[in-house]
Design a protein with these regions (language model features):
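Cofactor-binding loop segments of dinucleotide-utilizing enzymes, especially the Rossmann-like FAD-
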Residues: 17, 40-43, 150
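Short, well-ordered coil/turn residues at beta-beta hairpins
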Residues: 15, 107, 113-114, 141, ...
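Hydrophobic residues embedded in beta-strands of well-ordered beta-sheets
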Residues: 76-78, 136, 145
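Feature representing long, continuous alpha-helical segments
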Residues: 22, 26, 68, 108-112, ...
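A Rossmann-like FAD-binding core segment of flavoenzymes
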Residues: 1-9, 30-132
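A conserved FAD-binding loop/helix module that cradles the flavin
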Residues: 24, 148-179
């Protein structure tokens, strides 16, 4: 990816604050996206990503929308609720609490990198249908929205995640890739 553009363009929002989110954001930026915004419901201080990964994302030009919880994506816009930090949870991190205020991020593609569980509320808010196991299809019923990795399969192996990533790249970019 460092050597060339693989065809990603426009504004991309990556949801999450861990190492996977940092990797997805950096890859999108290096692949030709005009603007990549990492959306996280807490502040950078509470991001689970390694400091090194965070520094690399910043160096690559990834923008950060902190204290932001996505609620809807439609017509090229990601609507987020502004969050405030409340009391600490079991992990020791202060829990995000909705403020009732909303803002918008221009976005042509959303990449959700928030863990192994499907966010049912986010899926429902965006009209994404789930199967009987509570998982979305690879190419969901919403045009331009794909599910891959743990969101599609549940907890799985790295090899399965890489296979899903290759299928996603082929679907979005239109070119088969081998890894």
């Amino acid at each position: 990816v460092k050597a060339g553009n693989i065809g990603v363009a426009g504004n991309i929002a990556v949801i999450g604050g861990g190492n996977t989110a940092m990797d997805a954001a950096r890859l999108a930026k290096r692949s030709g996206a005009e603007r990549v915004t990492l959306v996280y419901r807490r502040t950078r201080k509470y991001m689970p990503a390694d400091e090194h990964e965070l520094a690399l994302a910043l160096a690559d030009g990834v923008e950060f929308a902190e204290l932001a919880a996505p609620v809807k994506q439609a017509d090229g816009v990601l609507t987020c609720e502004k969050m405030v930090l409340g009391e600490a949870d079991a992990s020791g991190r202060r829990s995000p609490v909705g403020s009732g205020e909303f803002f918008h991020i221009p976005c042509d593609l959303v990449i959700s990198a928030v863990g192994e569980q499907v966010d049912d509320a986010l899926m429902a808010a965006n009209g994404i249908e789930l199967d009987k196991k509570g998982r979305p299809a690879f190419q969901t019923n919403v045009e331009g929205v794909y599910a891959a990795g743990d969101a599609k399969r549940g907890p799985a192996t790295v090899v399965e995640g890489i296979a899903d990533a290759a299928a996603f790249a082929e679907a979005v970019i239109g070119t088969a890739h081998t890894y």
